[in-house]
Amino acid sequence: MPTITSYFGFLLASLIFTLALFIGSSKIRLL
């Protein structure tokens, strides 16, 4: 069970990091 939870947490963190990076790149492009 802990393995699945840690994997889900890692996946969620990766998704958030990618989304934040995409938004940052978009803002830089607008500027």
UniProtKB/Swiss-Prot annotation:
BP GO annotations: photosynthesis
Membrane topology of the entry: Single-pass membrane protein
Keyword match Transmembrane: yes
A family per Pfam: PetL
One Gene Ontology MF term: electron transporter, transferring electrons within cytochrome b6/f complex of photosystem II activity
Subcellular location: Plastid, Chloroplast thylakoid membrane
Spans traversing the lipid bilayer: 4-24
Function: Component of the cytochrome b6-f complex, which mediates electron transfer between photosystem II (PSII) and photosystem I (PSI), cyclic electron flow around PSI, and state transitions. PetL is important for photoautotrophic growth as well as for electron transfer efficiency and stability of the cytochrome b6-f complex.
Family classification: Belongs to the PetL family.
Complex and partners: The 4 large subunits of the cytochrome b6-f complex are cytochrome b6, subunit IV (17 kDa polypeptide, PetD), cytochrome f and the Rieske protein, while the 4 small subunits are PetG, PetL, PetM and PetN. The complex functions as a dimer.
Annotated protein name in UniProt: Cytochrome b6-f complex subunit 6
